């Protein structure tokens, strides 16, 4: 019997759609799912810890990671670099663990080229007005940066057709239930079951 590898789950969507909140709640409810910590050159937000939420790196350190092909994907977003360290993700999937990546859309498209068997989920807010309110509520960015994020979000919505699923994050419990249903359905797909049934 073949080894049953884990799922690679890619969660992305516009800034402020609530990807981080949904990811944290999904991990709380499904401890068998592992979170892939991304590397970034952006400054930590209040409460974020290096190695737990992100690997916070200088631009020079990040450039070295790119040159040494240590990243599964990387992208520049709003003036900062983001990327996914490759080794830990591949090791976890081969060991049978499900791994979730919470990454930007540019990065998700790179991952899709390398891992088309992944599960690609696009998280959207219920409206652009709601998205604007969420980003303003953070209180961590200037108005100029917020407007840039909103303009980027409008462009990013054009990529929804590149994903397998779309989840509207209106109410967190409902959105998390949708994510759990997607993962359950993917686990049951025939193409992911290496078994041959005999005598049925």
Swiss-Prot record:
| Gene3D superfamilies listed in its UniProt record | Guanylate Kinase phosphate binding domain, P-loop containing nucleotide triphosphate hydrolases
Q: Which Pfam family, any one of them, does this sequence belong to?
A: Guanylate_kin
Say which domain of life the source belongs to: Bacteria
Q: Which UniProt keywords apply?
A: ATP-binding, Cytoplasm, Kinase, Nucleotide-binding, Transferase
Q: What class of enzyme is it?
A: transferase
Q: What are the binding positions for ATP in this chain?
A: 13-20
Instruction: Tell me where in this chain the Guanylate kinase-like domain is found.
Output: 6-184
What EC number(s) would the UniProt record show?
Answer: 2.7.4.8
Reaction(s) this enzyme catalyzes, per UniProt: GMP + ATP = GDP + ADP
Q: Does the keyword Ribosomal protein apply?
A: no
GO MF terms, alphabetically ordered: ATP binding; guanylate kinase activity
Question: Which PROSITE patterns does UniProt cross-reference here?
Answer: GUANYLATE_KINASE_1, GUANYLATE_KINASE_2
Subcellular locations according to the entry? Cytoplasm
Q: What is its main location?
A: cytoplasm
Record bears the keyword Transferase? yes
Q: Which InterPro entries match?
A: GK/Ca_channel_bsu, Guanylate_kin-like_dom, Guanylate_kinase, Guanylate_kinase_CS, P-loop_NTPase
What is one term from the GO cellular component aspect held by the record? Answer: cytosol
State the family it belongs to. Belongs to the guanylate kinase family.
What does the UniProt record say this protein does?
Answer: Essential for recycling GMP and indirectly, cGMP.
PANTHER family according to UniProt = GUANYLATE KINASE, GUANYLATE KINASE-RELATED
Please state what the protein is called.
Guanylate kinase
Native organism is Desulfitobacterium hafniense (strain Y51)
Query: Gene symbol?
Result: gmk
């Amino acid at each position: 019997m073949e080894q049953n590898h884990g799922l690679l789950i890619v969660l992305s969507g516009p800034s402020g759609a609530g990807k981080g909140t949904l990811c944290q709640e999904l991990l709380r409810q499904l401890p068998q799912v592992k979170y892939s910590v991304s590397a970034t050159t952006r400054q930590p937000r209040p409460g974020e810890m290096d190695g737990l939420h992100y690997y916070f790196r200088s631009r020079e350190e990040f450039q070295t990671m790119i040159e040494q092909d240590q990243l599964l994907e990387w992208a520049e977003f709003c003036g900062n670099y983001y990327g996914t360290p490759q080794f830990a993700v591949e090791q976890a999937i081969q060991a049978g663990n499900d791994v979730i990546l919470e990454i930007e859309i540019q990065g998700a498209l790179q991952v899709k080229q390398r891992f088309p068997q992944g599960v690609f989920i696009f998280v959207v807010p219920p409206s652009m007005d709601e998205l604007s309110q969420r980003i303003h509520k953070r209180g961590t960015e200037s108005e100029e940066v917020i407007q840039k994020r909103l303009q980027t979000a409008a462009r990013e919505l054009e990529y929804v057709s590149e994903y397998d699923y779309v989840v509207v994050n209106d109410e967190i419990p409902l959105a998390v239930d949708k994510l759990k249903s997607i993962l359950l359905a993917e686990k049951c797909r025939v193409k992911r079951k290496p078994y041959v049934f005999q005598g049925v």
